[in-house]
Amino acid sequence: MMSRKTLSKACLLSYLLLVRVANSGDLAGDVGIGTTGLGLHASILLETDINARFGVNYMKLSTIMHDTDGDTNVDATLNTLDALLDWFPHKNSFHLTGGLVYNGNKIDTVTKLNGMTYKGTTYSMPLGTSLGEVDGKFNVGNIISPYIGIGWGNVLTHTTGWGLTSDIGLLFHGKPQITLSSNGCTAGPACVALIAKVANEEARLNDEYAGKIVYPVARIGASYKF
């Protein structure tokens, strides 16, 4: 285990390195918003036409969907960590970008059932019973997702101060993994039908989304060069 003294030295060296890079004019940061949520990135000059960019993006979105079977609470979480290289082939603000992204994007749903129809049969709940709820989870197939894209804005070419950045690209998250489960059903025979319906719906959704392996990325932001 790393000692507190060793950790303190590592933090101090990292801080001194960042200060040195910042003083050399080879460090810039940007904040932005887009389909990956709110983002914060830092760019470091590697070569005259190549920047390394590291960042974090996060946003949580919630909504309620209404259906005849019940109301569904939907919670979507955008959570990614970027490790990217920006290449400027024409010595201007246009750049090609590639890299790897830790992809923690996910969707969680909870449907509180107030009724159910399955294969033409409408099930009624005896007094004091309940269909419970159906929990759903949507997770990406690749926790480490490749990214390719283009963009405009070189945060390290202008003088100290503010600038603009933008990105358009594709995040290859792989085949999504969708799971559904029923919980808390006490409605007797209706529970058996519910389990079958949930299993069929899970298979249908996984089949429907099997080919949707990319996530579109579009971002715009403001940068600051130190």
Give short role names for the model-derived ranges.
Residues L40-I44, A83-W87, G98-L100, I148-N154, ...:
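Residues on the lipid-exposed face of transmembrane beta-strands in outer-membrane beta-barrel proteins
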Residues F94-G99, K112-N114:
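A eukaryotic "domain-to-IDR transition" signal
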Residues N23-L27, L38, T48-A52, N92-F94, ...:
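Outer-envelope beta-barrel architecture signal
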Residues D26-D67, D71-F88:
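Long, hydrophobic N-terminal alpha-helical segment
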Residues M1-G25, G211, F226:
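Cleavable N-terminal export/targeting peptides
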